[in-house]
Amino acid sequence: MNTGGRLIAGSHNRNEFVLINADESARIRSVEELSGQTCQICGDEIELSVDGESFVACNECAFPVCRPCYEYERREGNQSCPQCKTRYKRIKGSPRVEGDEEDDGIDDLDFEFDYSRSGLESETFSRRNSEFDLASAPPGSQIPLLTYGEEDVEISSDSHALIVSPSPGHIHRVHQPHFPDPAAHPRPMVPQKDLAVYGYGSVAWKDRMEEWKRKQNEKYQVVKHDGDSSLGDGDDADIPMMDEGRQPLSRKVPIKSSKINPYRMLIVLRLVILGLFFHYRILHPVNDAYALWLISVICEIWFAVSWVLDQFPKWYPIERETYLDRLSLRYEKEGKPSELAGVDVFVSTVDPMKEPPLITANTVLSILAVDYPVDRVACYVSDDGAAMLTFEALSETAEFARKWVPFCKKYTIEPRAPEWYFCHKMDYLKNKVHPAFVRERRAMKRDYEEFKVKINALVATAQKVPEEGWTMQDGTPWPGNNVRDHPGMIQVFLGNNGVRDVENNELPRLVYVSREKRPGFDHHKKAGAMNSLIRVSGVLSNAPYLLNVDCDHYINNSKALREAMCFMMDPQSGKKICYVQFPQRFDGIDKSDRYSNRNVVFFDINMKGLDGLQGPIYVGTGCVFRRQALYGFDAPKKKKTKRMTCNCWPKWCLFCCGLRKNRKSKTTDKKKKNREASKQIHALENIEEGTKGTNDAAKSPEAAQLKLEKKFGQSPVFVASAGMENGGLARNASPASLLREAIQVISCGYEDKTEWGKEIGWIYGSVTEDILTGFKMHSHGWRSVYCTPKIPAFKGSAPINLSDRLHQVLRWALGSVEIFLSRHCPIWYGYGGGLKWLERLSYINSVVYPWTSIPLLVYCSLPAICLLTGKFIVPEISNYASILFMALFGSIAVTGILEMQWGKVGIDDWWRNEQFWVIGGVSAHLFALFQGLLKVLAGVETNFTVTSKAADDGEFSELYIFKWTSLLIPPTTLLIINVIGVIVGISDAISNGYDSWGPLFGRLFFAFWVILHLYPFLKGLLGKQDRMPTIILVWSILLASILTLLWVRVNPFVAKGGPILEICGLDCL
């Protein structure tokens, strides 16, 4: 091999050799070798450099790239060579970009800003090596006009895309908008901008921009098939990306190392401190209060385990960014139908009296007006209460949508829920330039007020239900007069029936669904309603993606669906994503957020941590699903590339490693075959239990159809739609036949002997079906994504007061207890699947946390007991113990501060979350634990009422009202007991004196810790507006008094030995 006296270098990671020059004058390749080559990105010929030599972009591999592509890649791309991935260095005559070294080309600063002296005019303005002297050109001379790097002979001299100044000193150019008058004189808009930016597609004419992109796509296809084989196939991640349309639609943004590394180190340090703390606590018991010490140590160990389960899933938090412009470039091409995937939106409601129809109507209107192709959106409203009020309100909503939807899209209104748009105090004229906007906004506001009056009239009419029930306009009875016994109902209000808006544009589909209900059937509450919507939508529209929102969660960001599609439709990473979860944001909450309704710590810290693992858990609303994932299919397996071997190891070492690798691969293949065989056997057993000859049956089409029907149900239309990964319907299906099939799939007995609720759809078995559903999908190897756009995608209404908030938390905790006591418990379910171990820890924490209520209740009672008895849970504290306690409390505080820093959470939100953790733990979690045990073990059913979402006229009129509920008694009792203990402890110290104030300080600090966490109750006791109901106060004081007197009477922690006063009398003194 003739090396020409140069050094040869290579690597096992690159399939190439690099020739290193022996002296500075030598080049990697000569000018003769590179002359005449074409750019491997755009296909144009490579021009000469400033020095008159052939342009070489990469000094490592000399991959042929022209200067405009090189500068575009450095300015807009990843700034690296497409072949060897080496970062491009700045070449003489090219503009600087962020990341260039300070001394890089310092001798070229003049040429960087003055192109007239560098001889760069020809290659900047002409990609075909056409040379002309710009400085000497007369004002009236014909200058070749360029469109995105190519000459366009059809453009007249009066319609210049680039304006060149005749002065020899410098060159001006303009990013000119398209003027309708060709005689209009263009002028520079940004004279300081670098002229080179126009060499690679920065002219603002949209039609030419699209034409240029089309030509670039064609050139790219030629290069991809006929060019260098090292570029790989179309799915390879190493393919060079020429424009934004081929770049990823989203990217991960890890937390800065300056924030996350100290946080991780502190977690490890806190683990060490915890170990030393428990070592001290266990080896130093309190002899005169052994029971108190033992109980406290048990509680502390449980708290430590709970902290580990909560902490480690936050080890690798990340954030994400989306690129909506790239999504449009890739899937929305001008002159062609949109290629964005369809989305079926599910809205669920039950009781229109507690979930006002006006709130549901606003949610539906925000969905119909979403910024997405109308033929790709369908809204399905599930009315599980079969209320005629909901039906009529939805009919009025469909009529008003004909005016509201075109108004929103014409003026880009945000948010697109009219109630919140008109009530928000904001500058609605900002960025509005249309002269008719103010007039049309006033008219639209008047129309919406009339719409509200109609809805209010319907609500008032529905208050008085006729004895014989409601009837339709033609006199036929309303099918849903009996809520528990009625047929299935489907009504298509908008969509394919020809109803258009006032501007004659098509509207998204709007479908009313009320599934069949009969006595004796288990309808599985919300999970059953959602599964009915899956089947109905699969028959009528069959979009590949589903969005689930509650009736009070409207779309606050009209581009929310596009945000989700940036993840779902990403060709590189989208195939393995089962759902995109958005955070919950709320309206109608005061600034202090006294009851932690926003739940900021969970959504901005915990969920970001889970996103760095296998993805966030499903929280029940604001989630875009992949339909195939809900159907119980496994995630696509990623093919592992073979590892490269290195020649630097001895042969005997490679031989040993190869033997171990072969053994491991054989074992893995054997296990894989066994698993596949067991799956096939299990599938055949499910198809035909107790029969023989299953091998023959499995080969027949009838057996395959039987298997699908056993899984999805007895609907051939729906079974056929389930096999379409990209959605769509049969071409020969008529709307009438599809409607009949949709009625069938929402019948009561459709799910019998199928896998609905077990392996398909929303999973049954818990009132928190959201946790189970997400857990099932993660167990199948799918991953989820947490999307937090700058403008919140969805907003909803939070519980009005503390009582409703506690009932909401009670429902969540009861669902966790049900999952813990079921076969789907993450402690023992799903091993051998695709669930990662840190993700499993998060699911274990989500079902274990209600059990913390028992040690928390006991631990919050200990301060009062210590103050009443004069005992304490720790012995006399030494210097070592003092340092240990201070280190523990300090690590807890600093961990919280660092979490707030990288999670961007305020101190107020963090403290409210800590308060409500104690309040909910000693009230709702405790009740949920006992109700869950009764429900699972004894079969005692618990009925939950829907949380009221109606608001009064006052902004926060009911926010702090304490309504009667037994959930308020335990925390109030704890508060009173600790206040009594503080009073008794201080009084005893003043009366009798203390040898050491240290023990008293420790007990008082312990008691005040509990009182501060229960402060909202204390404010309810003392405040006027927030006063607690008298019955709760009476019961709490009575219970606290009984417990205090009983404790003083029993006094179990006082030694029983010693003199007895009745025997020795006064001589004992």
Curated annotation (Swiss-Prot):
It comes from the Eukaryota. Mn(2+) binds at residues 526, 550. The modification Phosphoserine is found at residues 229-230. It is found in: Cell membrane. The chain crosses the membrane at residues 266-286, 289-309, 854-874, 880-900, 916-936, 966-986, 998-1018, 1028-1048. Residues 287-288, 875-879, 937-965, 1019-1027 are extracellular. It is a multi-pass membrane protein. Residues 438-464 form a coiled coil. One of its GO terms (biological process) is plant-type primary cell wall biogenesis. The modification N-acetylmethionine is found at residue 1. Its EC number is 2.4.1.12. Keywords: Acetylation, Cell membrane, Cell wall biogenesis/degradation, Cellulose biosynthesis, Coiled coil, Glycoprotein, Glycosyltransferase, Manganese, Membrane, Metal-binding, Phosphoprotein, Transferase, Transmembrane, Transmembrane helix, Zinc, Zinc-finger. GO terms for cellular component: plasma membrane. Its main location: membrane. One of its GO terms (molecular function) is zinc ion binding. Its cofactor is Zn(2+); Mn(2+). UDP-alpha-D-glucose binds at residues 348, 354-355, 384, 525. A zinc finger (RING-type) spans 39-85. Partially redundant with CESA6. This is Cellulose synthase A catalytic subunit 5 [UDP-forming]. It comes from Arabidopsis thaliana (Mouse-ear cress). The gene is CESA5.
